[in-house]
């Protein structure tokens, strides 16, 4: 793979079987794979630029070809895995004492999980719709922690959330109520949220023709209102915001490659033409040849890069990298930080100025973190993978969020708000108010869009790379695996830009591909339903309906599917999703319905048509044979 005339990495394949033998990076480093006689990955080695070889991990497999034991030689932790009869992972035991167990329901959804370390653990249960209670069986209705329900959902006839009840304790509950934007025609509606109300506090939203957030009005408990208006260019890049909340107007200028070249801050105004000089300006200067998306100077501060496009000198800090894209060591400005990653590239440890924090993961979700200073924090997630609560020093705390997923506050079990956060549109922390007695505001790591914030570094860790809210860009380029997977969609992309310069209505929790904060979760749920039972045409109808809702925010099913490929939430749904993407009927249906804005009467018939086309293919037949063998049921045609 080459960018700007420079080859970033080269993969050498083994003869006969085509397995990846070695990946060599532009820095001279390489990763070498070792396979067992069954052609399963048995070990991996890191080869440094000077030729030294370090073994990273070892795998052993069970008789079904599943990894039974994984030994991480960097962290010294060995994990053993247990599976059920159809190959789903149901248990993990780690040599450091961490144990995880999972339970699935008849639709292949995670029904709940328990984990424990040092004899302290928690049980989380997801509540799905019960037909006998006149609930929709495909939707989540709540979450329990240690047997106590903490979240409950109510839906309208279209399956949209209209109320979320947060149970802080038996005696303290708050309720969020949602309304939705009407469609262009009578009787048509959308999945775009028009308002969110919680007690005497509310937010309302309007959108432009492309589905971008145009205005947000925040109504406080005292009845006062503060408005933010957003402006976008033809590429949906944020070019201006009139921010009454921050009492300023900000204008953004980009070059043709999607690089921000100037950011100007003015006194708050709603005038279309600004004649006064900016109160503050930030300037960005880029590489003039080769890889032109590389930021070389920010407000005069220099940035230098290695051959992979990773910064070596970054705004007063020195950075060291390994395995192509992994940030290993950062020094400067009183900071000395080391990071360690697992075989999937997820961070499992950081050591900052002598204090080590270990992360205990389920996929990319941090179930718990412990630090060498003796602290432990447990985190809890909803059925869509969004963090909603934490436990610290034996006390439960709950996050208050806005529609964008920004964590605005932390509440205790009495519903009292102890911490308040305020960010700019790009996630830079502007204000932190902490009324707690234990420094909760700084201790809590989840902030803007629900991302993990490294307080010491001033950046967000997005599961594969770091995002700097000061510059509004990723620190290093995206992994070129993204280009290999979706070359037609991403080869023209700026691999350093954050959410293609639309930070308001988009998020990128993986550091790979952005998604909209409003509707892609809904589409993802529908795809998961198809994966759980690909023989139910109503599940396919849901995919089509959600895809229609995304137009023109996301063009067709395929683009949304590409976004979901890089998340850990969808499990093994890639094959199903690709069937949607490449089914001719699906493309034709989506194209014919692009003029709509919301649900239509033809949605269900469209879903049935896609289902009919899919079930005639070889993928369906093979899958159904296995499904019938395991489940012993007939498909619903």
Where do the protein language model's features map onto the residues?
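Intrinsically disordered, low-complexity Ser/Thr- and acidic-rich flexible linkers and loops
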Residues: 49-52, 125, 131-136, 183-189, ...
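A residue-level detector for well-ordered beta-strand positions
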Residues: 11-12, 33, 59, 81, ...
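A motif-centric feature for acidic-aromatic and gly/ser/thr-rich catalytic loops and repeats
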Residues: 130, 178-184, 284-288, 391-463, ...
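Short, acidic, Ser/Thr-enriched surface-loop or helix-capping motifs
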Residues: 15, 25, 36, 62, ...
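Compositionally biased, low-complexity segments of secreted and virulence-associated proteins
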Residues: 511-535, 540-636
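Short, low-complexity export/processing leader segments characterized by acidic and small residues
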Residues: 347, 409-410, 428-432, 468-475, ...
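Beta-turn initiation residues at beta-strand->coil junctions
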Residues: 1-6, 12-14, 22-33, 43-50, ...
């Amino acid at each position: 793979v080459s960018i700007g005339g420079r080859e970033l990495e080269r993969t050498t394949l083994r003869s006969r079987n085509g397995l990846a033998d070695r990946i060599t990076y532009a820095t001279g480093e390489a990763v070498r794979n070792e396979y067992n006689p069954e052609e399963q990955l048995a070990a991996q080695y890191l080869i440094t630029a000077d030729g030294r070889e370090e073994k990273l991990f070892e795998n052993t497999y069970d008789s079904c070809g599943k990894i039974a034991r994984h030994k991480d030689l960097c962290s010294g932790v060995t994990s053993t895995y247990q599976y059920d009869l159809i190959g789903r992972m149901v248990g993990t035991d780690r040599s450091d004492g961490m144990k995880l167990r999972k339970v699935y329901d008849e639709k292949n959804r995670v029904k709940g999980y328990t984990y424990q370390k040092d004899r302290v653990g928690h049980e989380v249960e997801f509540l799905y719709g019960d037909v006998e209670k006149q609930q929709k069986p495909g939707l989540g209705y709540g979450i329990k922690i240690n047997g106590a329900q903490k979240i409950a959902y109510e839906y309208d006839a279209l399956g949209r959330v209209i109320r979320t009840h947060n149970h802080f304790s038996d005696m303290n509950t708050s309720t969020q109520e949602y309304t939705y934007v009407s469609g262009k025609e009578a009787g048509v509606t959308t999945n775009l949220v028009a308002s969110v109300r919680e007690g005497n506090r509310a937010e309302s939203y309007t959108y432009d023709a492309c589905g971008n957030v145009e205005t947000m009005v925040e109504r406080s408990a005292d009845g006062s209102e503060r408005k933010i208006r957003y402006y976008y260019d033809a590429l949906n890049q944020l070019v201006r915001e009139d921010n009454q909340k921050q009492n300023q107007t900000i204008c953004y200028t980009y070059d043709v490659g999607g690089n921000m070249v100037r950011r100007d801050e003015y006194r708050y105004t709603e005038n279309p033409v600004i004649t006064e000089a900016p109160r503050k300006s930030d300037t960005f200067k880029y590489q003039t040849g080769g890889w032109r998306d590389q930021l070389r100077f920010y407000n005069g501060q220099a940035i230098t890069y290695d051959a992979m496009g990773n910064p070596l000198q970054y705004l007063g800090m020195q950075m060291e990298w390994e395995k192509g894209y992994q940030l290993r060591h950062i020094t400067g400005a009183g900071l000395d930080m080391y990071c360690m990653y697992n075989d999937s590239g997820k961070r499992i440890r950081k050591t900052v100025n002598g204090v080590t924090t270990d992360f205990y993961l389920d996929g990319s979700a941090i179930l718990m973190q412990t630090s060498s200073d003796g602290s432990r924090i447990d985190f809890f997630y909803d059925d869509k993978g969004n963090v909603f609560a934490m436990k610290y020093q034996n006390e439960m705390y709950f996050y208050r969020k806005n529609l964008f997923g920004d964590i605005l506050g932390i509440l205790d079990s009495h519903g009292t708000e102890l911490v308040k956060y305020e960010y700019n549109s790009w996630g830079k922390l502007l204000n932190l108010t902490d009324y707690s007695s234990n420094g909760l505001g700084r201790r809590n790591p989840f902030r803007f869009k629900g991302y993990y914030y490294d307080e010491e570094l001033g950046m967000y860790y997005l599961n594969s790379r770091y995002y700097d809210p000061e510059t509004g860009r990723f620190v290093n380029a995206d992994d070129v695996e993204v280009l290999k997977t979706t070359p037609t969609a991403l080869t023209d992309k700026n691999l350093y830009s954050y959410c293609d310069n639309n930070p308001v209505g988009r998020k990128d929790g993986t550091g790979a591909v952005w998604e909209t904060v409003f509707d892609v979760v809904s589409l993802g749920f529908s795809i998961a339903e198809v994966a759980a039972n690909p023989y139910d045409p109503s599940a396919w109808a849901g995919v089509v309906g959600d895809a229609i809702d995304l137009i023109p925010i996301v063009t067709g099913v395929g683009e949304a599917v590409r976004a979901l490929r890089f998340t850990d939430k969808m499990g093994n749904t890639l094959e199903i999703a690709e069937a949607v993407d490449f089914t001719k009927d699906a493309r034709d249906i989506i194209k014919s319905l692009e003029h709509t804005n919301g649900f239509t009467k033809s949605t269900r018939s469209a879903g049935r048509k896609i289902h009919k086309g899919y079930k005639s293919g070889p993928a369906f037949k093979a899958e159904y044979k296995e499904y019938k063998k395991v489940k012993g049921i007939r498909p619903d045609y």
